[in-house]
From Swiss-Prot:
This is D-aminoacyl-tRNA deacylase. An aminoacyl-tRNA editing enzyme that deacylates mischarged D-aminoacyl-tRNAs. Also deacylates mischarged glycyl-tRNA(Ala), protecting cells against glycine mischarging by AlaRS. Acts via tRNA-based rather than protein-based catalysis; rejects L-amino acids rather than detecting D-amino acids in the active site. By recycling D-aminoacyl-tRNA to D-amino acids and free tRNA molecules, this enzyme counteracts the toxicity associated with the formation of D-aminoacyl-tRNA entities in vivo and helps enforce protein L-homochirality. A motif (Gly-cisPro motif, important for rejection of L-amino acids) lies at residues 137-138. The gene is dtd. Keywords: Cytoplasm, Hydrolase, RNA-binding, tRNA-binding. A Gly-cisPro motif from one monomer fits into the active site of the other monomer to allow specific chiral rejection of L-amino acids. GO terms for molecular function: D-tyrosyl-tRNA(Tyr) deacylase activity; Gly-tRNA(Ala) deacylase activity; Ser(Gly)-tRNA(Ala) hydrolase activity; tRNA binding. InterPro entries: Daa-tRNA_deacyls_DTD, DTD-like_sf.
Length: 149
């Protein structure tokens, strides 16, 4: 499971000119599910994201987590995070999870975050989405549950 995590002041995802999800201060997460992913990946990544200390404390040091600040989460599915661009000029997506399995894992990830008490909004799985991100910092991190990077 891979994630692009961005600290945001606000973020909105729109599908067919209708807002599907919108948050204030928190994290915008583009989430990709891989073929080999399972519940262990959900546990690892959800815990890592909710507890990353990337929000500033009173001294301006990145020392607070999403949970610490009562921040919100916007999760958008993004299978292209598993795009392999090493050969040729067109990415290959062989390592991306099959849609029916990926959707289930994506939904379980979202539910895990909600169960932790985080207000969590989402896009629509497999939809063509427009994502507006007001990146704060900017702070952007790449995470991989298999720790490939």
């Amino acid at each position: 499971m891979r994630a692009v995590v961005q600290r945001v002041k606000k973020s909105t995802v729109t599908v067919n000119d209708k807002v599907a999800g919108s948050i204030g201060q928190g994290l915008m997460v583009l989430l990709g599910v891989g073929r080999e992913d399972d519940d262990r990946d959900i546990e690892y990544l959800s815990d890592k994201i909710m507890n990353l200390r990337i929000f500033e404390d009173e001294n301006g040091k990145m020392n607070k987590s999403l949970l610490d600040i009562g921040g919100q989460l916007l999760v958008v599915s993004q299978f292209t995070l598993f795009g392999d661009c090493r050969k040729g000029r067109r990415p290959g997506f062989d390592k991306a999870g099959k849609p029916e399995i990926a959707k289930e894992l994506y939904e379980r990830f979202v539910n895990k975050c909600r169960e932790a008490g985080v207000l969590t909004e989402t896009g629509i799985f497999q939809a063509d989405m427009l994502v507006d991100i007001s990146n704060d910092g900017p702070v952007t991190l790449l995470l991989d549950s298999k720790k490939e990077f």
